Design a protein with these regions (language model features):
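Short microdomains enriched in Cys/His and/or Lys/Arg
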Residues: 64-74, 160-171
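Axial heme c-ligation environment in periplasmic c-type cytochrome domains
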Residues: 53-60, 74-110, 114-122, 150-156, ...
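N-terminal secretory signal peptides that target proteins for export/translocation
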Residues: 1-12
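Disulfide-stabilized extracellular ectodomain repeats and their linkers
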Residues: 40-43, 56, 64, 84, ...
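N-terminal targeting signals for Sec/Tat export/insertion, comprising classic cleavable signal peptides
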Residues: 36-61, 65-73
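Bacterial N-terminal signal peptides
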Residues: 13-25
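Extracytoplasmic/secreted proteins, especially bacterial periplasmic and envelope-associated proteins
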Residues: 34, 38, 66-69, 86-89, ...
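Sequence/structural segment immediately N-terminal to covalent heme-attachment motifs in c-type
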Residues: 31-49, 115, 120-147, 159
Length: 171
């Protein structure tokens, strides 16, 4: 079960959270390079050097507030990594500034630039795509997962295998 939504933001101080978001909103000139460096050394081995990985979510273009909240939840034990079993340790090694910088870096990456292979001709693809679109619309997923809701992750463009796993953790 995913415990991220159960983590009250008061578990880590509002001051820390706001300070991290200030780094995201108004970074110094070197922030992009430092954020990229943190991603390459701490994140890319699981999340992919080019932003695409097999078992983990695509982080490129993700909402910065969601990344900050997720990393803080992993760091403080309010969210448990049930996929790779390593996020809690990785996040605990990041400073608040590191978290803000990597969140800003990832938010600035265009997910449309990712080289994601989709087999449109695969048997059953059209039916599965249509069923997914209908389920998305009827379940009101977009209410939280569209770009205007900054605490929910962007799910458009995520891999089906990851979405299935993530959804199973919410049941």
């Amino acid at each position: 079960m995913n415990t991220l939504l159960r983590l009250p933001i008061t578990r880590f101080s509002w001051v820390s959270f706001c300070a991290i978001l200030l780094v995201v909103a108004a970074p110094p000139a070197w922030a992009e390079d430092r954020g990229a460096q943190i991603f390459e050394t701490q994140c890319a081995s699981c999340h992919g050097n080019e932003g695409v990985a097999l078992k983990t979510p695509i982080l490129h273009g993700q909402e910065p507030a969601y990344i900050v909240r997720s990393l803080m939840a992993f760091r403080h034990g309010g969210r448990i990594d049930q996929i790779m079993m390593s996020m809690n340790g990785i996040a605990s090694g990041l400073t608040e500034e590191d978290i803000g910088l990597v969140a800003r870096y990832l938010a600035g990456q265009d997910p449309c630039d990712l080289d994601i292979k989709i087999d449109y001709g695969r048997e059953g693809f059209r039916e599965a795509f249509s069923a997914g679109r209908e389920k998305y619309a009827s379940s009101n997923c977009g209410h939280c997962h569209e770009s205007f809701h900054h605490f929910a992750p962007r799910i458009m463009g995520q891999k089906a295998s990851y979405l299935k796993l993530a959804l199973s953790q919410f049941q």
